Amino acid sequence: MNWSLQLRSFILCWALLLLSPTGLAQYTATRDNCCILDERFGSYCPTTCGISDFLNSYQTDVDTDLQTLENILQRAENRTTEAKELIKAIQVYYNPDQPPKPGMIEGATQKSKKMVEEILKYEALLLTHESSIRYLQDIYTSNKQKITNLKQKVAQLEAQCQEPCKDSVRIHDTTGKDCQDIANKGAKESGLYFIRPLKATQQFLVYCEIDGSGNGWTVLQKRLDGSVDFKKNWIQYKEGFGHLSPTGTTEFWLGNEKIHLISMQSTIPYALRIQLKDWSGRTSTADYAMFRVGPESDKYRLTYAYFIGGDAGDAFDGYDFGDDPSDKFFTSHNGMHFSTWDNDNDKFEGNCAEQDGSGWWMNKCHAGHLNGVYYQGGTYSKSSTPNGYDNGIIWATWKTRWYSMKETTMKIIPFNRLSIGDGQQHHMGGSKQVSVEHEVDVEYP
């Protein structure tokens, strides 16, 4: 008989003893001790039935407590059984009277070490995988955000495509034969305008630089950031390349044919201004009188009357680099034909335009070269060029031939407007005349 059954039997016997006549016989009922009303017995004195009712009211709680005790005893019995089974298992594998087998402890120790090593290895592997998972999660989150941004951009573009096409570049309505003509007609804002020189068959777009004094400069060339490659062929230099912008903040070459049509159209000669900026932000200019570019039949020959002035110096007149006594003569530009890599018209036995990677009025080869290779930072060297020649954006009378300009501008204006509100004082009497050996006088129909 288990303990739960013994306990239940004990409690039942005790209850029967209370209910038996023997137990009740010891109780002598008197009025003093019996007829005292007690809510536990109802409205009756504690007769046998009253006590029975009283005990019955507690029977449910007693049964519950008994069941709880039985459950506890059952769990204890189960644990005891499990402990006995475990002891039996230990006794099977361990006999205190039997000495351990040779190497048993060492083998168990080695197995334990190996297990520990395996556990550590898997822990390290898990850490590595966790790190990789976090990295991939970061990439996923980043890509998800990028995809969201791209979807938004696509939605914006789709919405934009639903609208009628609009020209986002502002082109002014005023037209004329050059930018000064446009300024004379009342234009006061720099920007893009259409002009039609006298002998042009159709109008074309130019950038006009108009100042507060009413001067209208027609811009022929701009270098700003190296965004445009100036290594172009003859046709590209003829027609022009790059980008014209309303703010004048893009690189371009207007085109030799357009420059020819503008510069040759008027009885009033044009002045050419060259503006330079180095990588320290310093600026300088060089002005030339009676600037003209001939027709294609004459290889777009450059001519001018004389150097007016400017702190950049007269590089168009050549420069003595000290390499040869004839340096100055063979690096002058007045009267030179235009050359490109595929149309060589220079005085050099080789091809200046090809070795310098540009198009320009080459002699043998140059002292001023504004269409050269754009070198970030300005300074470059012979070893950094493909052929060992100075091929940067140079102006030898202001900087060395191994210093490439940061920004350049070539622009023209009618000569009689040059000194009006310009801020630069050029005196004709002090102007430097071109020497006889460089002077060129060419008539074009």
Swiss-Prot record:
Residues 400-422 are annotated as: Gamma-chain polymerization, binding amino end of another fibrin alpha chain. Keywords: Blood coagulation, Calcium, Coiled coil, Disulfide bond, Glycoprotein, Hemostasis, Isopeptide bond, Metal-binding, Phosphoprotein, Secreted, Signal. It is found in: Secreted. GO terms for molecular function: cell adhesion molecule binding; identical protein binding; metal ion binding; signaling receptor binding; structural molecule activity. This is Fibrinogen gamma chain. There is a cross-link at Q424 (Isoglutamyl lysine isopeptide (Gln-Lys) (interchain with K-432)). Conversion of fibrinogen to fibrin is triggered by thrombin, which cleaves fibrinopeptides A and B from alpha and beta chains, and thus exposes the N-terminal polymerization sites responsible for the formation of the soft clot. The soft clot is converted into the hard clot by factor XIIIA which catalyzes the epsilon-(gamma-glutamyl)lysine cross-linking between gamma chains (stronger) and between alpha chains (weaker) of different monomers. Residues 435-445 have a biased composition (Basic and acidic residues). Residues 170-416 form the Fibrinogen C-terminal domain. Disulfide bonds join C179-C208, C352-C365. CDD domains: FReD. It comes from the Eukaryota. Heterohexamer; disulfide linked. Contains 2 sets of 3 non-identical chains (alpha, beta and gamma). The 2 heterotrimers are in head to head conformation with the N-termini in a small central domain. PANTHER family: FIBRINOGEN ALPHA CHAIN. The modification Phosphoserine is found at S431. One of its GO terms (biological process) is response to calcium ion. Glycans are attached at N78. Gene3D superfamilies: 1.20.5.50, Gamma Fibrinogen, chain A, domain 1, Gamma-fibrinogen Carboxyl Terminal Fragment, domain 2.
